[in-house]
Amino acid sequence: QAGCSQSRAAFLTGLYPHQNGQIGLATWKYAMFSEKIPNVVKTLGKAGYRTGNIGKLHVNPEKAFPFDFKAIPSANFSRKGMSGYAENAKKFIKSSKRPFYLQINHPDAHRPFLKTVDGLPAKPLTGRDVDALPFMGINHPELRQQSADYYNCMMRLDSYIGDLLRVLAESGKAKNTVVVYIGDHGADVMRGKRTSYEGGVRIPMIIRWPGGKSGQDRKELVSTLDLFPTFCEIAGVKPPASLPGRSLRPLVAGEST
């Protein structure tokens, strides 16, 4: 489902919303059927991984996810203290003496679409610079401005992701760490978030896997449900039998399907 909590619960449990129970926003008191449902955090924790979460979790009940490290638990829609995401990531990675799983939830893909934060992007776009996002279907000046500010958020987010990758590189652990970049749903614009149109359900999934085949642009249909079994394969543990997803390792390795 193209909603925050539903998508996050699906990613963390490897189950569809109707299977795990998180069919609405945690803000509105929707919750999973049970805190005992297997999830990424519990499974990797039992496998010896240190687990961490930076940014909002937005899934109920939160106690179902026993992270070893937590920071910046708010949604932070005002974008205050954005350097704190990379700073806390540095603290977590530096203090981790065993394999780790860290998820970082940046607010900058979310409304409000702020034109600039911390001087980023250096050259913000305006509605005169872009067309409206194609799936909107209407190229109105107001929608062009919305699209421009969404692009400004994405350019800024790109800078913040660069900060995180530098932190990882400086830790000396980059060559032994898989990095996955995803969104929880499409852009919060017309025919995007909250809908089942392509603009709502299609999201980025970029994987940097040391030893994998780089530079690929795969066309297979995959989903965030495939990440839990992928992480299980990385950790060398058996995934729960109930998971509908499959490990993405063969695709990352360049194998045909």
Protein language model features and the residues they cover:
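Formylglycine-dependent sulfatase
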Residues: 1-257
